[in-house]
Amino acid sequence: MLCPTYTPSVYHFQTQKPVFRKQRFRVCSSTSGGEDDRFKVEYTPWLIVGLGNPGNKYHGTRHNVGFEMIDVLARKEGVLMNTIQSKALIGIGAIEDVPILLAKPQTYMNFSGESVGSLASHYRVPLRHILMIYDEMALPNGVLRLQPKGGQGYHNGVKSVMGHLDGRRNFPRLSIGIGKPPGNMDMKAFLLQKFSPLEQKQIEEALEQGSEAVKTLVLNGFNQGISRFNLVQKYKFHKV
């Protein structure tokens, strides 16, 4: 288990080997029954992963909204995404006092689990604190859904992640609706298509709303606030 202890100037994730440093907290392996206050469990870090494809050609496509959510979180929380580890672009920071590790796997969507499994193991993040963020065709464009667990839902990225987490599904996930392909449009072509101006506006609003939901989850868990968030999202485009 990882646990952070407060220091005035720096914090860093420490597991099998040192990685790199940021400000405000020190995250280290915990011990039981010790007398040293530095090893007191205060906060459990979160691994927050956005799924997508690397490279400029995929930027702004429907399949990459998970990456875009990570970009919004990094901007809002002042996290620098400047390190490559476990085939992922990562950044370490905090939401208030809770340490977070943001990650964008660079393996391409269908192999995302290679990065997630490695990072979760290296930093010893418990399953309940691995938040997966990805696109969802079963939801209307711009509609969000935050759940404590679920299946793969025919999403190859989520399928890969579950495969590298020993088939376990009890990790939270934030789904970002992108709608369904119109008519007989090929699904792959739809996923790699950029949004229309109206759709893009809906996605940008969803990313802002989603970032606040992630903050609520990290600080308070799945409370009534998350339930209200899901209810509002479900009916956000319904006209009375």
From Swiss-Prot:
<keyword id="KW-0507">mRNA processing</keyword>
<dbReference type="InterPro" id="IPR048076">
    <property type="entry name" value="CRS2-like"/>
</dbReference>
<keyword id="KW-0809">Transit peptide</keyword>
<comment type="subunit">
    <text>Part of large ribonucleo-protein complexes that include group IIB introns and either CAF1 or CAF2.</text>
</comment>
<dbReference type="InterPro" id="IPR018171">
    <property type="entry name" value="Pept_tRNA_hydro_CS"/>
</dbReference>
<comment type="similarity">
    <text>Belongs to the PTH family. CRS2 subfamily.</text>
</comment>
<keyword id="KW-0934">Plastid</keyword>
<dbReference type="GO" id="GO:1990904">
    <property type="term" value="C:ribonucleoprotein complex"/>
</dbReference>
<dbReference type="GO" id="GO:0008380">
    <property type="term" value="P:RNA splicing"/>
</dbReference>
<keyword id="KW-0508">mRNA splicing</keyword>
<dbReference type="GO" id="GO:0004045">
    <property type="term" value="F:peptidyl-tRNA hydrolase activity"/>
</dbReference>
<dbReference type="GO" id="GO:0006397">
    <property type="term" value="P:mRNA processing"/>
</dbReference>
<dbReference type="InterPro" id="IPR001328">
    <property type="entry name" value="Pept_tRNA_hydro"/>
</dbReference>
<dbReference type="Pfam" id="PF01195">
    <property type="entry name" value="Pept_tRNA_hydro"/>
</dbReference>
<keyword id="KW-0687">Ribonucleoprotein</keyword>
<comment type="function">
    <text>Required for the splicing of group IIB introns in chloroplasts.</text>
</comment>
<protein>
    <recommendedName>
        <fullName>Chloroplastic group IIB intron splicing facilitator CRS2-B, chloroplastic</fullName>
    </recommendedName>
</protein>
<dbReference type="InterPro" id="IPR036416">
    <property type="entry name" value="Pept_tRNA_hydro_sf"/>
</dbReference>
<keyword id="KW-0150">Chloroplast</keyword>
<dbReference type="GO" id="GO:0009570">
    <property type="term" value="C:chloroplast stroma"/>
</dbReference>
